[in-house]
Amino acid sequence: MAIRKYKPTTPGRRGSSVSDFAEITRSTPEKSLVRPLHGRGGRNAHGRITTRHKGGGHKRAYRLIDFRRNDKDGIPAKVAHIEYDPNRTANIALLHYADGEKRYIIAPKGLVQGSPVESGAGADIKPGNNLPLRNIPTGTTIHGVELRPGGGAKMARSAGASIQLLGKEGSYATLRMPSGEIRRVDVRCRASVGEVGNAEQSNINWGKAGRMRWKGKRPTVRGVVMNPVDHPHGGGEGKTSGGRHPVSPWGKPEGRTRKNKASDKMIVRRRRTGKNKR
């Protein structure tokens, strides 16, 4: 993909850019693979806000993506179209299988209309092909990796993301994640060859707040500019620093709040954070 820059005809257009969508070959999705998607505006079943800064945005339909691909082993397919998906940063590819079935997959870099695609232990090491990690050569760039065998692709699914297969030992494979983290997964887990396409998406300049609203993202307001009734940092005469250690709108101290997951024991080396990133 390439990025098209707008001329500064208005303040909102100045500096903004958009994808040229040159890779897209069809504008309407496959009707049999589309499901309705109802926006909840960040509310739960009680109508209370559980996720802030969400709401509005353009109406979307969900495209059913095949993240497992384990029931199509040995059945050849061909890429019929590369399509835009409003629900993710990556593009998607519509596959027509030899048995007549149609399915969507994440479109990797280099996959074009008419490309052959296959899955299974005997598949070639070509972009878009899906096979178990035990059958993928060391050093290969992959995406859409499972965390558990048969669980479906969980890692490296966004635009430009990729994972490197560093090695295999016994029943585990060692992977370098996009964040730099090194972790082990079962060699029976499946992955797709290549890196996810549409890598230039991260370089798009959205230009104005309105384009964020089209995506369903609402403003993020700082607590120190609120009133005391709305936030613990609110109130005070003139500009204040909040007068206390940073807390959430509900008074919980800012910082790490999540417990370790069971899968964390598979991490060999943590990703670099903070000053260690350099």
Swiss-Prot record:
Residues 253-267 have a biased composition (Basic and acidic residues). Residues 1-58, 225-278 are annotated as: Disordered. Residues 37-58, 268-278 have a biased composition (Basic residues). Pfam families: Ribosomal_L2, Ribosomal_L2_C. The gene is rplB. One of its GO terms (biological process) is cytoplasmic translation. Part of the 50S ribosomal subunit. Forms a bridge to the 30S subunit in the 70S ribosome. This is Large ribosomal subunit protein uL2. Keywords: Ribonucleoprotein, Ribosomal protein, RNA-binding, rRNA-binding. One of its GO terms (molecular function) is transferase activity. Disulfide bonds: none annotated. InterPro entries: NA-bd_OB-fold, Rib_uL2_dom2, Ribosomal_uL2, Ribosomal_uL2_bac/org-type, Ribosomal_uL2_C, Ribosomal_uL2_CS, Ribosomal_uL2_dom3, Ribosomal_uL2_RNA-bd_dom. One of the primary rRNA binding proteins. Required for association of the 30S and 50S subunits to form the 70S ribosome, for tRNA binding and peptide bond formation. It has been suggested to have peptidyltransferase activity; this is somewhat controversial. Makes several contacts with the 16S rRNA in the 70S ribosome. Belongs to the universal ribosomal protein uL2 family. NCBIfam families: rplB_bact (TIGR01171). GO terms for cellular component: large ribosomal subunit.
